[in-house]
Amino acid sequence: MKGFGNMMKEAQKLQAQMEKMQEEIAKKKVDATAGGGMVTVECNGKQELLSIKIDPEVINKDDAQMLEDLVLAACNEALRKSRELVQQELGKLTGGLKIPGLGM
């Protein structure tokens, strides 16, 4: 039973480390651009979009589709970078072991 007690302590320690890491990851930010920097999106480690900046030069009322595509591309890239950041940070805690459900 002593081994089980040690295992439980280690699990609690890992859980505390995980909670701390999730808080730290949530504070980190990534950004992505599209259209050569015409659209910039900022996202945090919780995959929440924080800001979208659009260069006025790209705004054309006759071609809204192009702007929509640029915003979508920048958002998707920012979210991809955020997921990658989470995996890298969690990999430090898990030693690179991919554990299902450990993402944020």
Regions found by a protein language model. Name each.
Residues 70, 74-82:
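Stable alpha-helical structural segments in soluble proteins, enriched in small hydrophobic residues
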Residues 11, 47, 71:
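Residue-level signature of catalytic and energy-coupling elements of molecular machines
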Residues 3, 63-70:
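Conserved acidic
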Residues 52-64:
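A short interface-forming secondary-structure element
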Residues 1-31, 81-104:
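Long amphipathic alpha-helical segments used for membrane anchoring, targeting, substrate engagement
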Residues 33-53:
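N-terminal intrinsically disordered, cationic/polar leader segments
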Residues 29, 36, 56-58:
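Short, well-ordered turn and helix-capping elements at secondary-structure junctions
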